[in-house]
């Protein structure tokens, strides 16, 4: 691929829902394969890639709490869902010859390695795609927060959030035809306006560590490589 990438190392955050495709639940393997191909294109540009995937296509911890259940147990179940998704993505990457590893915030040595910042950066230095599973390993934190945390730990140049739409809008464009898309915002503007892109803890953590957030549609084939080359349609959240 041609074009010099704007970033050397990035953290990609993908929602669990993105893996569902047109299904109502679970993993659409064709979608996992497409995301894997996008990551392969990014690697062909020389960009080091870390990935955090949500678990909402399988389970959400807040769903337990909303029905009177134990939120901590629910969040633990959600963390396990992210491990399932991470293993699925690793399988898709393996099929196309991309070397990758899953590091979990929850110890499960028979399934994947445990996370450590030092090992994660070492793997990325070797050119491996590192998939971070298990969220932060703690309840009450979203996978958005986990993505911002891992981005800071690996010293990522940018946090890319692949969503259902091509950027940040003033309202849900699927519900409000008058919603306007922003080309750029500051972290403070996102927080002050309460824009639904990532939870406030994630945005604040990215701001504190001077990490730009780039929001784009994960459903565009080759979209990740386009963004990395500064060509794609997106919203950039940065204080610079």
Swiss-Prot record:
ATP binds at residues 13-16, 56, 60, 163-164, 169, 172. Allosterically activated by GTP. Inhibited by UTP. Pathway: Pyrimidine metabolism; CTP biosynthesis via de novo pathway; UDP from UMP (UMPK route): step 1/1. Keywords: Allosteric enzyme, ATP-binding, Cytoplasm, Kinase, Nucleotide-binding, Pyrimidine biosynthesis, Transferase. It catalyses: UMP + ATP = UDP + ADP. Catalyzes the reversible phosphorylation of UMP to UDP. Its EC number is 2.7.4.22. Belongs to the UMP kinase family. Coiled coil: none annotated. Homohexamer. GO terms for cellular component: cytosol. It comes from the Bacteria. SUPFAM superfamilies: Carbamate kinase-like. This is Uridylate kinase. Residues 21-26 are annotated as: Involved in allosteric activation by GTP. UMP binds at residues 55, 75, 136-143. Disulfide bonds: none annotated.
């Amino acid at each position: 691929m041609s074009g010099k990438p704007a970033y050397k190392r990035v953290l990609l955050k993908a929602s669990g829902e993105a893996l569902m495709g047109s299904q109502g639940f679970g993993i659409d393997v064709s979608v996992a394969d497409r995301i894997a191909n996008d990551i392969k294109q990014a690697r062909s540009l020389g960009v080091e890639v870390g990935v955090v995937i949500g678990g909402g296509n399988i389970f959400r911890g807040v769903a337990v709490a909303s029905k009177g259940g134990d939120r901590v147990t629910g969040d633990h179940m959600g963390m396990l869902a992210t491990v399932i998704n991470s293993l699925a993505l690793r399988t898709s990457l393996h099929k196309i010859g991309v070397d990758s590893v899953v590091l979990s915030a929850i110890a499960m040595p028979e399934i994947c390695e445990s996370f450590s910042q030092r090992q994660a950066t070492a793997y990325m230095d070797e050119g491996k795609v590192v998939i971070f599973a298990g969220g932060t390993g703690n309840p009450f934190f979203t996978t958005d927060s986990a993505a911002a945390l891992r981005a800071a730990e690996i010293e990522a140049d940018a946090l890319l959030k692949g969503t259902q739409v091509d950027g940040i809008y003033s309202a849900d464009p699927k519900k409000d035809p008058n919603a306007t898309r922003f080309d750029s915002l500051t972290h403070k503007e996102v927080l002050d306006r309460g824009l639904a892109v990532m939870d406030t803890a994630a945005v604040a953590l990215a701001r504190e560590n001077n990490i730009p957030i780039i929001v784009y549609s994960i459903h565009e084939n080759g979209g990740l490589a386009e963004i990395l080359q500064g060509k794609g349609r997106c919203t950039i959240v940065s204080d610079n």
